[in-house]
Amino acid sequence: MTSLIDLGRYVERTHHGEDTEPRSKRVKIAKPDLSSFQPGSIIKIRLQDFVTYTLTEFNLSPSLNMIIGPNGSGKSTFVCAVCLGLAGKPEYIGRSKKVEDFIKNGQDVSKIEITLKNSPNVTDIEYIDARDETIKITRIITRSKRRSDYLINDYQVSESVVKTLVAQLNIQLDNLCQFLSQERVEEFARLKSVKLLVETIRSIDASLLDVLDELRELQGNEQSLQKDLDFKKAKIVHLRQESDKLRKSVESLRDFQNKKGEIELHSQLLPYVKVKDHKEKLNIYKEEYERAKANLRAILKDKKPFANTKKTLENQVEELTEKCSLKTDEFLKAKEKINEIFEKLNTIRDEVIKKKNQNEYYRGRTKKLQATIISTKEDFLRSQEILAQTHLPEKSVFEDIDIKRKEIINKEGEIRDLISEIDAKANAINHEMRSIQRQAESKTKSLTTTDKIGILNQDQDLKEVRDAVLMVREHPEMKDKILEPPIMTVSAINAQFAAYLAQCVDYNTSKALTVVDSDSYKLFANPILDKFKVNLRELSSADTTPPVPAETVRDLGFEGYLSDFITGDKRVMKMLCQTSKIHTIPVSRRELTPAQIKKLITPRPNGKILFKRIIHGNRLVDIKQSAYGSKQVFPTDVSIKQTNFYQGSIMSNEQKIRIENEIINLKNEYNDRKSTLDALSNQKSGYRHELSELASKNDDINREAHQLNEIRKKYTMRKSTIETLREKLDQLKREARKDVSQKIKDIDDQIQQLLLKQRHLLSKMASSMKSLKNCQKELISTQILQFEAQNMDVSMNDVIGFFNEREADLKSQYEDKKKFVKEMRDTPEFQSWMREIRSYDQDTKEKLNKVAEKYEEEGNFNLSFVQDVLDKLESEIAMVNHDESAVTILDQVTAELRELEHTVPQQSKDLETIKAKLKEDHAVLEPKLDDIVSKISARFARLFNNVGSAGAVRLEKPKDYAEWKIEIMVKFRDNAPLKKLDSHTQSGGERAVSTVLYMIALQEFTSAPFRVVDEINQGMDSRNERIVHKAMVENACAENTSQYFLITPKLLTGLHYHEKMRIHCVMAGSWIPNPSEDPKMIHFGETSNYSFD
């Protein structure tokens, strides 16, 4: 509920009878005087279920309206109502972006009614009569509807109609110079100088903004047109040069086309020449054919006598050959008969020799047998003597040897099993030793490695981060774009600062990958996030300058900011500054005194604390400040835990000691295993020595067994030899007892019979030799006659062969020429030439006839000459530029050149027109802007003298109109230079003072119907606040100025007031009358609404 003066005491006095005198006048509701309101100013605002209000009304002054009240009572709700009620965007307020969030809790519908003073500038708006003094705009916000309902004078309209009305009234809710909410004060300080000029012009004279926009547009058009014109002029020069080149190419092309025409004409002439050449060749072929035919007939006539003689000789050779065959048979039979006699004689001679040998054998047989018997008997006796001397080993000896051999084999098997067991144990120990050695090497390497990726093996939830880091390392394109986590790339100078850093950086950020810019984020974020569940942090351009200098921090008892004791990748450190604010956290390894801590939690003169978080000793202190009421400050602290992260080295000293101890233990284990292995090796050597001894014993036994086997083998062989000699001796004795004298006599008789048979055969052979001689003589005579006849036949064959070869050759020539002449009469080539000739039109034939007649007269109408002409033309044409596109390009260049020569003068005129318009608009804008800014600067300087050292407003006018800007220059110390107002150089209170004074300086020049400033005095000290308040009151309450709204949560004593200003005190509480129950109470305390009759 809003109130100006509490009239309750007057009502109470009447009820108690303290003033019972009859009165001639009584209090009644007064009708407001609207004549003092400027067109477009706000007369009244009525709110229902809006933010903190259930139902309230603001009846406003046409000059300064100062809205005061405690924090949370609903002062800024008035600002929200003005913005949203006039169809403004929630962004202009700087709070929630959803309109439905402004509906009071527990309600579904909210209503804003704003009554404005009508203006002559309002035209063509439905439901608004120019005769009406006021315009009522109603906005109904429903939680369940996306769009609000709007009414003008209780008639429903669209939002665009309301926005049109607001624009016609020159209400600029998006202009920080007119509408500055509490949340957008800092935005005004960050407002760029170019934008500040635009907003200032809009507040004062919107028509000048149109001129500025036109100048910017004209300048852009001028630059674009000038660039285009320069390009076209250069293009004209280029095209003219290109045109000259193309004309030469066209001339070459015409020469090419002429030669091409000649080539085409001679190509068409070729069929005629070829037909002529073909006919000439055909006549030559016919003459050759006739000659071949005559030659063939002549050779056949010469061949006939020789053929008859050949036939007679062939008959004679045949008869003699038959006779020779018969004589040869007779001769062979006689020769065969003699051969048979020879064979019989040879057989008889062999038999005689054989019989004689048998006689000799039988005559000397008895002596030989006796000698053999004596020799065999001697061998037999000698073998018996040797056998008697040989001692055969006993069977038990061999059995003893077998037993000893089995014992040795069993013993060897046992020892080999033991050796196998030792080898198995040794292999296992070797495997363990290699494993221990690898572990020791790995741990030794971990003590010296610089790669911190091992940190990611400490926890299971870091496995995804480790895999993501490895993938980034495998992709060179991600290098310097995706940075590894802070726990790998950043370290503190010692363990205590590492614990500080771990306490201030949340765990998700400590393991997050840093993306250096938005382009890299767009390029690589999805490939990483699709594969791994990791966090990404994108670097921004946010400022990371510490809030106060390092010297101040040290004066307060700290060693510096936490960021001062951190090293590593600068970009990752910047990310930690932006996300965890480590550049704003002062640290001290010793604990601060209570007095030092009390000083830190005490707000500064501007009401704000210096640091929101500090670290001292082993405590982290968060200092929080309430946003409402007295803005109470309360600290909370927590103990700082030790961490394994952010260490200067990859591992802590404890980890190093632990790993070194593990390495020592591994070495001891390795030596123990080695000792065991040495013992096993010695044991194995003993077993191998035993095997060697057993092998030696086995060799001795084998040698003994071999010797015994050899004795047994020799005994058996000797016994067998004796038996064989005995049998042989018996056989010889039997043979010696036989009588062979009769056998010798029989063989002598057989020899006599054979010699008689031999004499008979020799007599028969003499007779056969005589017959053979006669047959041979007759055969030789017949063979001579046959040879002579065959020689004559062979000679005749040579003669006939010559005639046959000649005949075949001539016949082949005849057939070939006959066939060739037949084929040449109508060849496919000849037909194609004729078809081509017939395809020519009459004009072509006439042209060709003229050329042919010319060549015929010159004696050159032949294929060779025409072909030479074609070859020459083709050689010449190959040297000629025949780019057929040259004509087209020349036409295009000519057309383009003609068009450019036509358009360039017109563009030059247009450019001059634009330049003239620029000059004209510049002459209009610059003096007015200079005058406005000069007046604003003078006004601002006068106002600023009361709170600071000096202030000024400058209009910067570079060549580019888009860069024209206003710069607010201030200084708060006499020896300091003027500096531009921005969000970095000045403190919050200094920015607030500068901002409000600039807005006050605009007051008398602005054309806006009203201006709103919400809690601009935050951060000011009481002196500056009084000075600013006085300046604001004096300017806002001056004549012919726009309506002004100032919202503030505090009200100092001794402020300057003016009779035209109105104070609206916003109060809340259970004791406040409820206007929903008693509608009259909504006007309770508003003295401006009462009059006395």
UniProtKB/Swiss-Prot annotation:
Residues 208-354, 404-441, 651-757, 884-926 form a coiled coil. Pfam families: SMC_N. GO terms for biological process: chromatin looping; chromosome separation; DNA repair; double-strand break repair via homologous recombination; recombinational repair; regulation of telomere maintenance; resolution of DNA recombination intermediates. Belongs to the SMC family. SMC5 subfamily. Gene3D superfamilies: 1.20.5.110, 1.20.5.170, P-loop containing nucleotide triphosphate hydrolases. GO terms for molecular function: ATP binding; ATP hydrolysis activity; damaged DNA binding; single-stranded DNA binding. The gene is SMC5. The flexible hinge domain, which separates the large intramolecular coiled coil regions, allows the heterotypic interaction with the corresponding domain of smc6, forming a V-shaped heterodimer. Present with 892 molecules/cell in log phase SD medium. ATP binds at residues 69-76. Transmembrane segments: none annotated. PANTHER family: STRUCTURAL MAINTENANCE OF CHROMOSOMES PROTEIN 5. It is found in: Nucleus; Chromosome. It comes from the Eukaryota. It comes from Saccharomyces cerevisiae (strain ATCC 204508 / S288c). SUPFAM superfamilies: P-loop containing nucleoside triphosphate hydrolases (SSF52540). Acts in a DNA repair pathway for removal of UV-induced DNA damage that is distinct from classical nucleotide excision repair and in repair of ionizing radiation damage. Functions in homologous recombination repair of DNA double strand breaks and in recovery of stalled replication forks. GO terms for cellular component: chromosome, telomeric region; nucleus; Smc5-Smc6 complex. This is Structural maintenance of chromosomes protein 5. Keywords: ATP-binding, Chromosome, Coiled coil, DNA damage, DNA recombination, DNA repair, Nucleotide-binding, Nucleus, Ubl conjugation. Component of the Smc5-Smc6 complex which consists of KRE29, MMS21, NSE1, NSE3, NSE4, NSE5, SMC5 and SMC6. Residues 442-650 are annotated as: Flexible hinge. Sumoylated by MMS21. The keyword Thylakoid does not apply.
